[in-house]
Regions:
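Bacterial N-terminal signal peptides
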Residues: 9-19
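Sec/Tat signal peptide C-region and signal peptidase I cleavage site
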Residues: 20-24
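Bacterial N-terminal signal peptides that target proteins for export
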Residues: 1-9
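Eukaryotic scaffold repeat domains enriched in small/polar residues
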Residues: 26-380
């Protein structure tokens, strides 16, 4: 494992159908800095159900808006509903009190990857790849990304349970590459331990958040070959207790979410492609879930008091600029914004891994532009 130079050090309700151990694991953190209302309206009922009768969405673990009319969704299979279906069912499992994260006995590995149009209708169903998740005794697909520097716009899907990462053609017709060995965890150069995310540097290198077992970030070359790694388990600067998401910013900045540590670790690339330098760490949050980096700030999701989901904006110096809370109450509430993405029109999409659905947020007409999340930073 490479050594990270330390340039600066600055020192984490009830779930429907969730076990007590899981409740304790999902920590919350205080809200600090400016707090205000959401700058978005949620479009109620946007995600149109498509499952056969007796089934509903599973956990929405990965969302990526390639365009306003093509939104990729990775879900943890579908949810088998009780028979008879309760009258209050309104298209998603959470509406009848099912927490799909924990109701694993109701999970079926179907329709794991698909795209939606701007109105929330299914556009493409990639069920030819459902077999990549079948037989999983864990959560399965965890994150979905597209490399902004790839002219072929290949689709990357991280499978946490099988310790693998898949690379598909943009139209879903071909599985181009598989990284990792199915059901074989490891901490060497070719294996993963419950990987969580991938990110892409402008020079072609690929970063893998690896993950809940290995607590490291792996640096790969453009062809997926191992270069080096950084991180490690712990509570110190540059260490992780479950790295969950990655974001890339200007001037070589790398933001890595330490999920169970409730922190954001900041690194910077160097002239050596095998090394990064540690820059800073910002703590005091609940579980940190997903991140988007803009030109001069970051947005990430986390749990605040009462396990309410917060969107937090910070500048690159670690100052908390704004926090807004996502409602928990149905019909439009969230138990968890596990993943989020923003399209080129400024619409926000949030995947709920517990209620089991994806929703669309549109900017309010009078929203302050400074409080809106922009698409991820890309080098020009």
């Amino acid at each position: 494992m490479i050594q990270i130079s330390r340039t600066l050090v600055v020192s984490a309700l009830l779930i429907l159908a969730g076990p007590v151990s899981a409740l304790r694991a999902q920590s919350t953190g205080p809200i600090e800095g400016p707090v205000g209302p959401s700058p978005y309206n949620i479009i109620s009922g946007w995600h149109k159900p498509f499952a056969e009768e007796g089934f509903a969405f599973g956990g929405s673990s990965g969302v990526f808006a390639e365009s306003p009319n093509r939104i990729f969704v990775a879900q943890r299979g579908e949810t088998r509903l009780p028979d008879p279906i309760p009258a209050e069912f309104s298209g998603f499992a959470g509406s009848i009190g099912i927490n799909v994260l924990f109701a694993t006995d109701m999970r079926v590995w179907e329709h794991c990857l698909y795209t939606l149009d701007s109105d929330g209708n299914v556009r493409e169903m990639w069920d030819q790849w459902d077999h990549l998740c079948e037989g999983s005794d864990g959560p399965g697909p965890h994150r979905l990304r597209i490399n902004p520097y790839d002219p072929e716009r290949r689709v990357w899907l991280v499978n946490e349970t099988f310790h693998q990462i898949y690379v598909f053609s943009n139209d879903g017709s071909e599985l181009i590459k598989t990284l990792g060995e199915k059901n074989v965890p490891g901490d060497d150069e070719t294996h993963f331990g419950r990987p969580q995310d991938v990110a892409f540097l402008p020079d072609g290198r690929i970063l893998v958040a690896d993950g809940l077992d290995n607590h490291r970030v792996i640096i790969l070359d453009a062809d997926g070959n191992y270069i080096s790694e950084f991180g490690g388990f712990g509570e110190g600067p540059g260490q992780f207790n479950g790295i969950h998401a990655l974001g890339i910013g200007p001037e070589g900045l790398i933001f890595a979410l330490d999920r169970s540590g409730g922190r954001v670790n900041v690194f910077r690339t160097t002239n050596d492609p095998a090394e990064v330098e540690f820059v800073d760490v910002w703590g005091g949050f609940g579980l940190t879930l997903d991140i988007i980096v803009n030109d001069d700030s970051i947005w990430f999701t986390t749990f605040g008091p009462g396990r309410l989901v917060n969107f937090v904006k910070m500048d690159f110096e670690g100052n908390r600029l704004y926090t807004w809370t996502v409602p928990r109450e149905l019909p439009d509430g969230y138990l968890e914004v596990h993943t989020f993405s923003v399209d080129s029109d400024g619409n926000l999409y949030g995947g709920d891994n517990q209620y089991g659905r994806t929703q669309k947020f549109v900017p309010k007409p009078d929203a302050d532009p400074a409080l809106l999340i922009k698409p991820p930073w890309v080098a020009r």
